[in-house]
Regions:
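Periplasmic/cell-envelope proteins involved in peptidoglycan metabolism and beta-lactam response
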Residues: 1-236
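Active-site loop and adjoining helix of the penicillin-binding protein/serine DD-peptidase-beta-lactamase fold
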Residues: 175-218, 233-316
Length: 316
């Protein structure tokens, strides 16, 4: 019985702090960084220390000013009966400096890692997003989460009744294991060109959505992939959730005109037709008991075979 009580007492004195692993970097095919991890500070509180100082209201007020948070919300957090609680995660450098200068009793900063996408909106639908806890939520950051997420570590500290660390007491440090990096088939330059041209098309045509894919026909590698509307994964909460939908892979499409190039290539390879052969399009053609029309029912007139493919002519 005595051993059991001693073990319980020790458990009550132990505080465990999770150390988040750094996510692996996502590179394009040429080694250019598309998604990286950067260090940032997060604000935490040890309520027992604040209670001992009798300055709960003062601490809440000063934190609210620096963190731009509701004072009551902070007060409720720092007066909870817990040994450790987050106040605000991943604050900027200026905020960290202000908090260090305030040196508030029971308030501390813990270095964490957050995801950063240095190219902004570029390849956002490919890369996806990561949440506040540094876990993948969408795109490749979600698909490869186990690979690039790493393994979190932790610090276990023994503290006294008011939450202060006990010198030379029981401590345990398990370091985090950072995630592996990933190299994509995506080419940043080709991705930029695709997105630039896609934006032009969207501006001209005003569609509800648009997407584009560039593939190496010899290997099947995807060199670029983009979807519109777009978003910045660094601040994805500022955009409608629908902007994150990747129309290039999430939606099903009838093959339609995309198969014409296959038929055309086969015909040219078998010498059934040459690029210079000419065709006349009156706007429609009767096949068996059906009449097939070109888009919009308009006539393309006289064209060579290259123009037939260019205009996606159903008659030609």
């Amino acid at each position: 019985r005595g051993d059991e009580l001693a073990e319980r007492a020790l458990d009550n004195r132990m505080r465990e702090i999770t150390l988040k692993a750094k996510r692996g970097t996502i590179f394009d095919r040429n080694g250019r960084e598309l998604a990286i991890s950067v260090s940032t500070d997060s604000v935490y509180a040890v309520p027992a220390q604040i209670e001992k100082s009798k300055k709960e209201r003062e601490v809440a007020q000063k934190l609210a000013e620096v963190l731009n948070m509701d004072e009551k919300e902070i007060y409720d957090r720092i007066t909870r009966q817990v040994s450790f609680i987050w106040i605000k995660r991943q604050v900027d450098l200026e905020t960290s400096q202000k908090l260090r200068e305030l040196d508030l009793e029971g308030i501390g900063l813990l270095e964490e890692s957050r995801r950063f996408y240095p190219k902004g909106t570029l390849a956002s639908h490919v890369l996806g997003i990561s949440g506040i806890d540094n876990t993948g939520l969408d795109g490749l950051d979600l698909y490869y989460d186990q690979l690039i997420g790493g393994t979190d570590g932790k610090i276990v500290i023994e503290h006294d009744a008011v939450g202060r660390e006990i010198p030379e007491a029981t401590h345990r440090y398990i370091p985090p294991v950072d995630g592996s990096s990933v190299v994509l088939t995506i080419d940043e330059t080709i991705q930029y060109i695709l997105e630039r041209e896609l934006d032009k098309a969207v501006e001209q045509r005003q569609p509800k959505a648009a997407c584009g894919i560039v593939m190496d026909p010899k290997t099947g590698e995807i060199l670029a992939l983009a979807s519109r509307p777009n978003f910045d994964p660094n601040r994805y909460n500022d955009y409608p959730a629908g902007n994150r939908r990747n129309f290039a892979v999430h939606d099903a499409y009838e093959p339609g005109s995309t198969m014409k190039i296959v038929t055309a290539a086969a015909a040219m390879e078998e010498d059934v037709v040459k690029a210079s052969d000419r065709f006349h399009c009156p706007g429609s053609i009767k096949v068996a008991n059906r009449r097939i029309s070109c888009a919009g029912g308009t006539s393309h007139g006289s064209m060579d075979f290259t123009e037939v493919v260019e205009h996606s002519c159903n008659v030609g």
